[in-house]
Amino acid sequence: MSETAVSIDSDRSKSEEEDEEEYSPPVQSSPSANFEKDRHLMYLEMMYELLPYHYQSQEINRLTLAHFIISGLHFLGARDRVDKDVVAKWVLSFQAFPTNRVSLKDGEFYGFFGSRSSQFPIDENGDLKHNGSHLASTYCALAILKVIGHDLSTIDSKSLLISMINLQQDDGSFMPIHIGGETDLRFVYCAAAICYMLDSWSGMDKESAKNYILNCQSYDGGFGLIPGSESHGGATYCAIASLRLMGYIGVDLLSNDSSSSIIDPSLLLNWCLQRQANDGGFQGRTNKPSDTCYAFWIGAVLKLIGGDALIDKMALRKFLMSCQSKYGGFSKFPGQLPDLYHSYYGYTAFSLLEEQGLSPLCPELGLPLLAAPGI
């Protein structure tokens, strides 16, 4: 087995004996004017081999971290630097399976879970019981498999989809896991993306999900995570991308007749454009600082509705460059250390900006276009 699979799946991200003292981010020199592709490759390859101890608290999210690394390498044109067979075997080991077909009616979700920490030996053979399938982990698992070119017809999609509908609530929202949890637009999006990637909508009631999404739209045109909540960049992305994946809104709403649209694209456009701050970056909510990840969350919404030409791209690029680390990767704010989450969405943002040498983006799925079926 390759070192990569061992490091991703190890019990510890780094030796616990290592000194874990706090340290302050280094003072950054003047930001580079160039997208440092080679440094980003080195950063992701380092993370692919060994996760630093700072990620110990995210042990439950190993699949998500792997998605950021492997999909990030694809954006950088380096998909072939991973052992696809080893990665596929590792990802597939996280799928839960029902004991029998009757088990599909027990209310559990048989998707993918995010970590070995939610598996437990249950018999003399050492087989593992999967008891923590999660919608977000399932999205990440399928995303990785698509990115490495794995045939999704080889997974037990029938059990996954039949059991996924157990998570949908009466109001159309989704729980992330069968033992309960928050219900909001994040998990509606995960469900829609899962159905889209598996090319089957048997796992959700689309009409009910659509109505829930529309109930989350605020007076200002944006969407909150739940009905009646403040408009938020991430929630707005989940709403618009879900509606697009489900086929309820088309391409380039602003250029087409919007009178028959189920949303008001002009009001949404205005809200999104107001999120670009004076420093060129995008904020997630009113009166919040600019943050690297919202260059994707808001930028992708504008791309989906046909309003991306109105982004001040030079200013956005300058902000993103200020968040580019000299070590590779991107930080949340200028001058901080990079992390995998903001690095990945930094790469997707630069793909939206059509940075030379990056793979094009499928904004609906947040994946490289070549990994997106039917787009």
Curated annotation (Swiss-Prot):
Any one Pfam family match given in the protein's UniProt record, by short name: Prenyltrans
Disruption phenotype: No visible phenotype under normal growth conditions, but mutant plants have an enhanced response to abscisic acid (ABA)-mediated stomatal closure and increased lateral root formation in response to exogenous auxin.
Top EC class, one word: transferase
Reactions performed catalytically: geranylgeranyl diphosphate + L-cysteinyl-[protein] = S-geranylgeranyl-L-cysteinyl-[protein] + diphosphate
Temperature optimum or stability note: Optimum temperature is 30-37 degrees Celsius for CTIL substrate.
Tissues showing expression: Expressed in roots, leaves, stems, flowers and siliques.
UniProt GO MF annotations: CAAX-protein geranylgeranyltransferase activity; metal ion binding
pH-activity profile: Optimum pH is 7.9-8.5 for CTIL substrate.
Binding site for geranylgeranyl diphosphate: H232, G233, G234, R285, T286, N287, K288, Y294, A295, F296, W297
Region listing for Disordered, in residue ranges: 1-33
This protein's UniProt keywords: Acetylation, Magnesium, Metal-binding, Prenyltransferase, Repeat, Transferase, Zinc
Free-text remark on how the cofactor is bound: Binds 1 zinc ion per subunit.
Residues holding Zn(2+): D291, C293, H342
GO terms under cellular component: CAAX-protein geranylgeranyltransferase complex
One GO-annotated biological process of the protein: response to water deprivation
Modified residues (N-acetylserine): S2
EC numbers, comma separated: 2.5.1.59
Swiss-Prot/TrEMBL PFTB repeat ranges: 157-199, 206-247, 265-306, 313-354
SS bond partners: none
Gene3D superfamilies reported in the protein's UniProt record: 1.50.10.20
Cofactor(s) the protein requires to work: Zn(2+); Mg(2+)
Function: Catalyzes the transfer of a geranyl-geranyl moiety from geranyl-geranyl pyrophosphate to a cysteine at the fourth position from the C-terminus of proteins having the C-terminal sequence Cys-aliphatic-aliphatic-X (CaaX). Seems to exclusively prenylate CaaX substrates with leucine in the terminal position. The beta subunit is responsible for peptide-binding. May negatively regulate abscisic acid (ABA) signaling in guard cells and auxin-induced lateral root initiation.
Family: Belongs to the protein prenyltransferase subunit beta family.
Subunit (UniProt): Heterodimer of an alpha and a beta subunit.
Name of protein: Geranylgeranyl transferase type-1 subunit beta
Taxonomic lineage: Eukaryota, Viridiplantae, Streptophyta, Embryophyta, Tracheophyta
